[in-house]
């Protein structure tokens, strides 16, 4: 994506002339693998571990300096070749051009008026780099033997990209030459830029991403040097950390899901041309047309000639955008922060609370979200907080009697409080919890705003501080919202106002009979109405998808974080509705299994 590629462009033709002993690097990578495979550090020790791993990585990078495969010239020099290649192979190339938009980097600009919902871009399967094409490439023999490559499609795609980049006659060279040489993902942050994220919620994922990427590189360096099926790979004589970091970032910022050719499963893919579109708020307008076997995109809105063409990547928080896509999106209507809550097993009423939560399809301990938009909490979190704050008598009312099931159904509905006292308690609790989270930051909102005025601040440091500031602003907003609700319900309690009562016909949420198995669906229905996207299983997600014209579908990611096994099959219903999701579905390399 353009926004992810503001940094310098790829520069040189083949590997460089520096010499370093493979055995020397093998020893260093063995040390790195051991360090990255050690147990997770204790509280407060994560930064120390990060700096130790980073020191080893930097030592390896220094030894390998000049060994990476790169390209001559700037990436934009290759745009004409990309358009010619795409056109010759059946992609649409009319109506737009690739342009540098300064702050957002490269993107697509309309060269004619494009109407909302007009099909303006399509890319056939043959142009896509997929896990399937990786299996059929020079990587195939190693793929067939390595369980990590088989289980983690994103890693297989990264190696596919590296092998094709190192092959001058690769079919995908016109595409690969237009990819940026560096990214703004945290893997490229300087240590001081990472330090800007200290005390944020995102820092733990940043540490994990860096550690797992280092571990993967160390593991695969040994594989490439020693595995008999790696002998013919063009990486045998030159596989640097810089190469792997680039491939990892290329994939995590660009990968998407598409159905396999027979439509029975989903696979990961890189989609040339389409992946030049930058993000804005809206709806997903990209899907996969199985009949024509191509990725298709309709216009999100009316675009006039000269306008930048945007698409919607999905409901990602800014932490996800920064960590996995390498950019911060201002005014992100889907921004949120995590809040971990659970019912203590030492709670005298634990068993009763656990049972009520189970009937509502909610775990006794989970990570919820506080949202940038109103309301700040989802129906699921509201239901959890209500149960969390219930008295013994209130719990009995939700477990026993003819109206118990009906009460469960309205747990996530803000219009029907359990009691005024319960509402006061839950909003007081949320206010206190958000206030405590705010106090964990080392800087204030005002201090962050002052730092952002510094004209010498790097792009990556700016992203980090904006992310830090955004987290605090969401928490501060939650505190204010909770305080307002607390006082609202306290007033009702003092006035002894009658509780709103519902009629069975008001629910309108049941499909068929009443039963405990339907309860989670009610909360999910409320989530939809509130505009809140909670994580659902693959089947549940597909069932929500509505087919649109041109075989396109607007839907959520079918593979959370792109880490589902490539061997997992889809049901016929899922196969019919599977789409190529936008960048919102981009997964990260830090999802690699712990055994790596």
UniProtKB/Swiss-Prot annotation:
Reaction(s) the record says it catalyses: L-histidyl-[protein] + S-adenosyl-L-methionine = N(tele)-methyl-L-histidyl-[protein] + S-adenosyl-L-homocysteine + H(+)
Note on domains (UniProt): The SET domain specifically recognizes and binds actin, suggesting that it does not accommodate substrates diverging from actin.
Region (Disordered): 1-22, 551-596
Pfam family, one: Rubis-subs-bind
Chain intervals with Acidic residues compositional bias: 571-584
General function of this protein: Protein-histidine N-methyltransferase that specifically mediates 3-methylhistidine (tele-methylhistidine) methylation of actin at 'His-73'. Histidine methylation of actin is required for smooth muscle contraction of the laboring uterus during delivery. Does not have protein-lysine N-methyltransferase activity and probably only catalyzes histidine methylation of actin.
One of the GO BP terms on file: peptidyl-histidine methylation
Similarity section: Belongs to the class V-like SAM-binding methyltransferase superfamily. SETD3 actin-histidine methyltransferase family.
InterPro entries in the cross-refs: Rubisco_LSMT_subst-bd, Rubisco_LSMT_subst-bd_sf, SET_dom, SET_dom_sf, SETD3, SETD3_SET, SETD3_SETD6_MTase
A GO CC term assigned to this protein in UniProt: cytoplasm
Subunit structure: Interacts with MYOD1.
Single Gene Ontology MF annotation: histone H3K4 methyltransferase activity
Coiled-coil residues: none
Keywords: Actin-binding, Cytoplasm, Luminescence, Methyltransferase, Nucleus, Phosphoprotein, Photoprotein, S-adenosyl-L-methionine, Transferase, Ubl conjugation
UniProt biased composition (Polar residues): 10-20
Class of the enzyme per the UniProt entry, highest EC level: transferase
Cytoplasm keyword on record: yes
Organism, as annotated: Rattus norvegicus (Rat)
EC numbers: 2.1.1.85
Post-translational modification: Phosphorylated by GSK3B, which is required for recognition by the SCF(FBXW7) complex and subsequent degradation.
Subcellular location: Cytoplasm; Nucleus
SET domain span: 94-314
Binding-site positions, S-adenosyl-L-methionine: 75, 104-106, 254, 275-279, 325-327
Protein name, per record: Actin-histidine N-methyltransferase
